[in-house]
């Protein structure tokens, strides 16, 4: 699974996930949402599970991470309102350390150098 993060001209965080033929884009209206994903990864490392929410204008994404040894299950759900419920956007398993390192590198790349 390949993860890439960028910030668009409206200061929205864009996360692109590619895994084989699957290509998914997850967005957040606040570019600082990346730190919540890092915290969820840290929780998964320490407690076996972590989650965070990325808010968008039309709803919110929910990242759920479950660690089992060196494997990580990554689930991303989308909800546009209480009547529609949660829709699965992504459900994949990958190597935990590879995922953590990719996200950390992408977040560091987004940070301005001062």
Language model: regions and residue ranges:
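Short, well-structured hydrophobic secondary-structure segments
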Residues: 27-62
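N-terminal "first-domain core" detector
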Residues: 1-31
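Generic structural signal for short, flexible, solvent-exposed coil/loop and linker residues
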Residues: 2-6, 52-54, 88
């Amino acid at each position: 699974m390949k993860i890439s993060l960028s910030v668009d001209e409206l200061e929205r965080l864009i996360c692109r996930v590619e895994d084989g033929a699957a290509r998914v884009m997850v967005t957040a209206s606040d570019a600082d949402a990346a730190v919540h994903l890092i915290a969820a990864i840290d929780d998964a490392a320490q407690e076996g599970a972590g989650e965070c929410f990325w808010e968008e204008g039309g709803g919110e994404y929910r990242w759920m991470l479950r660690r089992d040894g060196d494997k990580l299950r990554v689930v991303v759900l989308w909800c546009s309102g209480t009547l529609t419920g949660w829709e699965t956007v992504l459900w994949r398993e990958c190597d935990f350390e590879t995922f953590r390192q990719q996200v950390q590198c992408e977040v560091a790349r987004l940070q301005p150098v001062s």
